[in-house]
């Protein structure tokens, strides 16, 4: 407690007070609320009390003698009763003035500093150490210093630590305006023309509104200009996620160090072991099967026949070239590949598939679809466009259409793992892996009714690589569609393992790929930005690396399961020894 007291005192002394706190003449007193000096007020109410009581006693004695009911009172008696009650209330408060005086400068431990002293309130709110003690404890140090220290037992409220933020008077006015709702938080960037300053002001306003600290969320060291209008709105800081490296992954004759951003212990280590097994066995091979981003608007007609007419028109090969020309105007990289339609009554779903170069391509294909819809209004004026996306795409949702038709990059990756490597590195046997894969990834997933989930943990690797390289983490839903196959080859001595992933949605330009950290990870893989020699080559390479990393992760986890090492490894690498119950929330 003494440590907190000293730190609070020192930190407050470091701030220049707006006005000195007088200890004698200028100190606030409870009697300041009275209209007259204390000695005059006391004399008036003492005299009034005893006079009124004496008058009432005399009147009651006369009523008793004359047999007059006591409850029958005259106007003068009513005035005397009121005077005696009022003076009694004053005298009762007078005897408690000393007690009130001792508390008048010390706010309750359960409230923030009051608005009566604006400057002291701001110092208290900005002082980091003041959060460790009851509010106001640091402010009344001069008062307590005049009294002998006595142990006081109070119920202290634990406040979050508030970071020390240097704000100008202008910033302080803006913060108050945001807190009271006069200035919308989302408009700070446009009003201030300074993204870093806007984030700092928004952050401070949020802390004051919620009473919760954001001291653990970093603010400095980030380029807020880079995310304006592109990655995130109304920022108050940025997250820190550790990035580990798995590899080298030997894929198609080249080595790659795979960055993985994750908070799950054992994940990078396990994937790294899989990479080692693949490398010692001669590497893995990956092949691109399809490359096309999709978007499926939904339109409605008055009759199902009219919806069928449009379906036949769109699927007629003679009309495809015209539609492709209209679609491809949206971008110099966009190339319409196909249009597939599905009817539900009067509603028609049009699934456009488009090559998008090195971009993930959602915006590109959406603009192309809008061009085609505008073009179709000429021949089909009764077509009502319900939505640019009708979920037949299907984006960020597990869907059979993605599992069957594919979305983004469809990749298959395979490797033959030597029997000696299976035994020495993976600590299991070929036979055990093949049996476990059949019963877990195939039969077990079928029993669960899985859709694209015929794997051990593909989404673990996909999400970790996506976060590290600036992809959309929400698209791990369809991107993690994967079927893992294992088979004994070469007379049962070696293991053939493969992963087939029909919907890897990645890009090397746009979105989060332009952020400094994510751009560095893309550069590590050699896929930063757009390919100048062959448009789309970088995003295709990134997709194959994702598949290769998934292959390594599947191989290692399945081996741990087959050898009974899963629980042991997670107890070693995926448990925290920190006592989180002692961390203030």
Curated annotation (Swiss-Prot):
Lineage: Eukaryota, Viridiplantae, Streptophyta, Embryophyta, Tracheophyta
Species annotation: Gossypium hirsutum
Region entry Linker, spans: 98-169
Similarity-based family: Belongs to the HMG-CoA reductase family.
Pfam families for this protein: HMG-CoA_red
NCBIfam families assigned: HMG_CoA_R_NADP
Subcellular location: Endoplasmic reticulum membrane; Mitochondrion membrane; Plastid membrane
Record field: catalytic activity: (R)-mevalonate + 2 NADP(+) + CoA = (3S)-3-hydroxy-3-methylglutaryl-CoA + 2 NADPH + 2 H(+)
Role summary: Catalyzes the synthesis of mevalonate. The specific precursor of all isoprenoid compounds present in plants.
Cross-referenced InterPro entries: HMG_CoA_Rdtase, HMG_CoA_Rdtase_cat_sf, HMG_CoA_Rdtase_CS, HMG_CoA_Rdtase_eu_arc, HMG_CoA_Rdtase_N, HMG_CoA_Rdtase_NAD(P)-bd_sf, HMG_CoA_Rdtase_sub-bd_dom_sf
Disulfide bonds: none
Keyword Transmembrane helix on entry: yes
Entry membrane topology: Multi-pass membrane protein
Gene Ontology BP annotations: coenzyme A metabolic process; isoprenoid biosynthetic process; sterol biosynthetic process
Keywords: Endoplasmic reticulum, Glycoprotein, Isoprene biosynthesis, Membrane, Mitochondrion, NADP, Oxidoreductase, Plastid, Transmembrane, Transmembrane helix
Domain of life: Eukaryota
GO MF terms held by the record: hydroxymethylglutaryl-CoA reductase (NADPH) activity
Region ranges (Catalytic): 170-585
Biochemical pathway: Metabolic intermediate biosynthesis; (R)-mevalonate biosynthesis; (R)-mevalonate from acetyl-CoA: step 3/3
Its EC number(s): 1.1.1.34
PROSITE patterns assigned: HMG_COA_REDUCTASE_1, HMG_COA_REDUCTASE_2, HMG_COA_REDUCTASE_3, HMG_COA_REDUCTASE_4
Protein name as annotated: 3-hydroxy-3-methylglutaryl-coenzyme A reductase 1
């Amino acid at each position: 407690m003494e440590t907190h007291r000293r730190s609070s005192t020192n930190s407050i002394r470091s701030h220049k007070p707006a006005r000195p706190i007088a200890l004698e003449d200028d100190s606030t007193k409870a009697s300041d609320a009275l209209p007259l000096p204390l000695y005059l007020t006391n004399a008036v109410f003492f005299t009034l009390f005893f006079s009124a009581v004496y008058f009432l006693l005399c009147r009651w004695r006369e009523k008793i003698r004359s047999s007059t009911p006591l409850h029958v009172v005259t106007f003068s008696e009513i005035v005397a009763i009121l005077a005696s009650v009022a003076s009694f209330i004053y005298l009762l408060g007078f005897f408690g003035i000393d007690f009130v005086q001792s508390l008048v400068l010390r706010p309750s431990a359960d409230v923030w500093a009051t608005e009566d002293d604006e400057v002291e309130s701001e110092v208290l709110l900005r002082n980091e150490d003041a959060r460790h003690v009851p509010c106001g404890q640091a402010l009344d140090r001069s008062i307590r210093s005049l009294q002998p220290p006595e142990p006081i037992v109070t119920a202290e409220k634990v406040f979050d630590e508030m970071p020390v933020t240097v704000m100008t008077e202008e910033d302080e006015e803006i913060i108050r305006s945001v807190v009271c709702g006069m200035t919308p938080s989302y408009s700070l960037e446009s009003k201030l023309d300074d993204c870093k300053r806007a984030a700092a002001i928004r952050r401070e306003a949020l802390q004051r509104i919620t009473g919760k600290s954001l001291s653990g969320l970093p603010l400095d060291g980030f380029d807020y200009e880079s995310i304006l209008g592109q990655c995130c709105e109304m920022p108050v800081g940025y997250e820190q996620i550790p990035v580990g490296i798995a590899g080298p992954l030997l894929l198609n004759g080249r080595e790659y160090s795979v960055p993985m951003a994750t908070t799950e212990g054992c994940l990078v280590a396990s994937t790294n072991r899989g990479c080692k097994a693949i490398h010692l066995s001669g590497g893995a091979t990956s092949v691109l099967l399809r490359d096309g981003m999709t978007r499926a608007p939904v339109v409605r007609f008055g009759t199902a026949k009219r919806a069928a007419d449009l379906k036949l028109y769109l699927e007629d090969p003679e009309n495809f070239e015209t539609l492709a020309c209209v679609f491809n105007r949206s971008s110099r990289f966009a190339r319409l590949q196909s249009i597939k339609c599905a009817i539900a009554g009067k509603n028609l779903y049009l699934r456009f598939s488009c090559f998008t170069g090195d971009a993930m391509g959602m915006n590109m294909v959406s603009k192309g679809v809008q061009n085609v819809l505008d073009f179709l209004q000429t021949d089909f004026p009764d077509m009502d466009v319900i939505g640019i996306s009708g979920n037949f795409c299907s984006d960020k949702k597990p869907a059979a259409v993605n599992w069957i038709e594919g979305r983004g990059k469809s990749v298959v990756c395979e490797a033959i793992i030597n029997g000696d490597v299976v035994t020495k590195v993976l600590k299991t046997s070929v036979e055990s892996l093949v049996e476990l894969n059949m019963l877990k990834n195939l039969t077990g997933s079928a029993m669960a009714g899985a859709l694209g989930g015929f794997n051990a943990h593909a989404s673990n690797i996909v999400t970790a690589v996506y976060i590290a390289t600036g992809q959309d983490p929400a698209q791990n839903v369809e991107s993690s569609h994967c079927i893992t196959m294992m088979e004994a080859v070469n007379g049962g001595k070696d293991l053939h393992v493969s992963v087939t992933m029909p919907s890897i949605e990645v890009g090397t330009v746009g979105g989060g790929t332009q952020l400094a950290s994510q751009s560095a990870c893309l550069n590590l893989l050699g896929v930063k930005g757009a390919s100048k020699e062959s448009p789309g080559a970088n995003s295709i390479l990134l997709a194959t690396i994702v598949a290769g990393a998934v292959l390594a992760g599947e191989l290692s986890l399945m081996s741990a399961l087959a050898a009974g090492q899963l629980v042991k490894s997670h107890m070693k690498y995926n448990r925290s020894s920190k006592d989180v119950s002692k961390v203030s929330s």
